[in-house]
Every structure is written in structure tokens, then in C-alpha cells.
Amino acid sequence: MAIPVLICDDSSFARKQMARSLPEGWDVELSFACNGEEAIQAIKDGKGEILFLDLTMPVLDGFGTLAQIRKEDLNTMVIVVSGDIQPEAHAEVMGLGALDFIKKPASKDKIKEVLTRFGIL
């Protein structure tokens, strides 16, 4: 059965690049969101069991999205994928419940390693 995976990034290029970086043969049903508000709705609609989340976006950024997921106790596993590699950002997203933080651009090997480590793959 396909796993609902959501990629949330305001950049269409980054969304496509992330989709191409997912492991070969991983049975997923892929959805996309351009900002945190869209991501929250997609999760509520059952489209985001796993969420790859950017931090810097308009409308609702990644930090706000994580906070909203926690506040509403939404059922999703969040992996942050961002160019913002400041130690403070890393600590904040982990404190908000993210499984891990991957630096953009995300390599296939790194994504596979994170998914395997958390028993997702």
C-alpha cells in the first residue's frame, strides 16, 4: 500500500528536486504544497503521513507549520529539508517534533539513510 508523502516548499524547482531524490521503488502517493497552510490542509486530508518540509516559505513558514502540527496533534512524521543550517534552526525544529533536519539539496543517500533510521523505509 502506497505511503502518502507530502513535499512542502514554496519553490517548484525544490519540490521537483526533492521528489527526484526519493528512494527508487519506494511505494508512495506523492502530493505537494507551496506553504504551511496548504501542508496542514493536505495532512488533514490524509496526504501527508510523511512530510518533507522547507523552513522559509510565505503564508506559514516551516516553524509555524511544525507548531501547528503539534498544536492540532496531527498524525505526520516531519523531516525538515532546508538551506537554513543555523544550529538554532536545527534545535528549534527538533524541539517542535521534527524527526530530522536535512540540508538542501537533499541527496538520495541522505534521504534513504534518514528513512531507514526511523523505520520508514
Q: Residue ranges of each PLM-predicted region?
A:
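Conserved sequence signature across two-component system core domains
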Residues: 8-9, 33, 51
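Two-component/phosphorelay signaling modules centered on CheY-like receiver
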Residues: 12-31
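Acidic catalytic/metal-coordinating carboxylates
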Residues: 35-38, 61-64
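Active-site beta3 strand of CheY-like receiver
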Residues: 46-52
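Receiver (REC) domain active-site loop signature in two-component systems and cognate sites
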Residues: 57
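Alpha4 helix (beta4-alpha4-beta5 surface) of REC/receiver domains from two-component response regulators
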Residues: 64, 85-100
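C-terminal output helix
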Residues: 106-116
